[in-house]
Amino acid sequence: MPVITMKQLLEAGVHFGHRTRRWNPKMAPYIYGARKGIYIIDLQKTLKLVEEACDFVKSKASEGATMIFVGTKKQAQHVVKEEAGKCGAFYVNNRWLGGLITNFKTIKPRIDKLIELEEMEKNGELAKLPKKEQSRLRKALEKLRKNLGGLKAMDRIPDIIYVIDPRKERIAVAEANKMGIPVIGVVDTNCDPDPVDFVIPANDDAIRSIKLITSKIAEAYLEGREGVSFTEETPSEPIQSDSSEEEEGSLDISDLFEDTDLKEEE
């Protein structure tokens, strides 16, 4: 059974790329064509690459691999937290702290401090302190929660990293590359796909697109960990395309622009 269907991809606006003046030529193999100044992503390739990424995640998760979801852009923050929470993955949705992967030993004490302060808050110790000290520690706690709240259970660097928009998360991607950690990325038409091991060409600005792809990665991770199946029973609806020219039986590219609001560029 397919992990995802063509209908789902279309309805979520996954096919909307950036304007043609804002593109990376390295994304050309993943582009179906262009119309009205906007690139259209080849969903036939997206469909295949989502399947490949999910198969990889499921396989590694079944072996006990850990995973971190990274999405700090506004549209991705809630989705990343929600989906990582569902599958038990770590997440970063506010700011990537430099050295999180390459120098984890300097980050771990901050995670430990977060856990310590939360325990103090829970058992009432924090409330017993002088008001000035309380205020200082509560501010520190709020900051730690914002940046490290999704990493409290992480005691070593992750085995897989999933990023939404590798262009924005370039520091996280660079650290993963340096440490030899496989990178799965939702890659839009303005990104460089080279640093990403598992490219998922997709709209990385629309919430519905981000939600759809991220939920499938999360389901694959959970399925690998617990053996729960989430695959779709509805068969996919393939698009016949291998270039910007329309062929007999292919999707009419003009039909893809009915919901242009699905591209929520920053």
Swiss-Prot record:
Ranges of compositional bias, category Polar residues: 231-240
UniProt-listed PROSITE patterns: RIBOSOMAL_S2_1
InterPro entries linked: Ribosomal_uS2, Ribosomal_uS2_bac/mit/plastid, Ribosomal_uS2_CS, Ribosomal_uS2_flav_dom_sf
UniProt superkingdom: Bacteria
Keywords, sorted A to Z: Ribonucleoprotein, Ribosomal protein
BP terms from Gene Ontology: translation
Acidic residues: bias regions: 243-266
Transmembrane residue ranges: none
Gene Ontology cellular component terms for the protein in this record: cytosolic small ribosomal subunit
One Gene Ontology molecular-function label: structural constituent of ribosome
Residue ranges, annotated region (Disordered): 227-266
Record-linked CDD domains: RPS2
Annotated NCBIfam families: rpsB_bact
Family per similarity comment: Belongs to the universal ribosomal protein uS2 family.
Record-given protein name: Small ribosomal subunit protein uS2
Species assigned in the record: Pseudothermotoga lettingae (strain ATCC BAA-301 / DSM 14385 / NBRC 107922 / TMO)
